[in-house]
Amino acid sequence: MDWWDQALSMEHELYGFLPWPRVERAVFDAQISAGWMHSGYPFMAHDLSVPGVVNVSQMAEEGDWGMFHELGHNHQWMPSTLPGTTETGCNFASVHLMEDLVGISGHGAIIPEQRDSRTRSYFENGANISDWSVWVALETFLMVKEEWSWSAITTALSVYYDLPASEVPYTGEEKFNSWVLHLSNSTGMNLAPYHAAWGLPLDQSTFDSLDHLPVWVDDPLRGDYFEYPAILRGLHSPSISGTNSTNLSWETYDNGTNITLTVFYGESDGGLQQSAWSNSIVHGSTDVGDDYIEITGLSCCGTDYYARIRASNDAGETWFGPVTWSTDYSDD
């Protein structure tokens, strides 16, 4: 029983509902109400499982993914259970206990080759949220766990237990947005672009609420599975530039994947059509932080100019701007 006490304590701590209010009970029988095992109070399993679960040596060496999984169900909280993840969130317990208590991966579905193959297939097929469930969805959480440990997920889950009624998410869309907000705040990073890459339907208000946090720009999807767009902010030129030049500046908030920046400028705004611009400069790649480019060869003496920046990669392009300025009448 000491071994199972430890296992259950680890599950309680993982899901963050402490102190756990009850003793978990299990019933083993020749005929149960559904399946091989099922969650509930009591948790139920067939009597063929009894020899293993009372053999502490076997449990310590092999664990029992299914037992951990069903007991994980008993810890799920519906407001934090995203659409498609009923059979995912309970596997947090299975992964955690198999790895950190037993010391093995415990399931063929989470060996590196299977994880890579499943993730690659998901993104090659368009990263549709309708396909985001069970093992694919688990991968989304595992990548976060491997960057920040389970504690980030525990902290986010714990928020839900004390939410005022007005903030409890009910619809699928509310749950997706709420989770990304709480998990981002837990990690201290903006995880909206990461979850949007997986296909989660996020509102613009979620992106806006997190734009004070740095973007997770080295997540495992980047380059290998998904090409992110860049996000530039604060595109600026002095309203009165030099006689024949100006410095165009901006903040690269997210440098995306394999991004090339091109600056388009001219005496009229060409919009989002490359062919409508009279001049362009290829700036190339950009790093997170402040950046700029000097534009020279401008006409002097009060000539009005417009500029936009295009950030492009093989996945598409995003335009930023416009910004406007007028050239000075003298070098003074």
Regions found by a protein language model. Give the residues of each.
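Catalytic cores of extracellular degradative/oxidative enzymes
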Residues: 1-146, 154-157
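Beta/coil-rich, acidic/histidine-enriched accessory regions frequently appended to metallopeptidases
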Residues: 172-229
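Proline-enriched interdomain boundary motifs that mark the N-terminal boundary
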Residues: 229-238
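Conserved aromatic anchor
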Residues: 244-256
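Recognizes extended acidic, P/S/T-rich segments that occur
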Residues: 260-301, 314-318
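Extracellular fibronectin type III
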Residues: 315-332
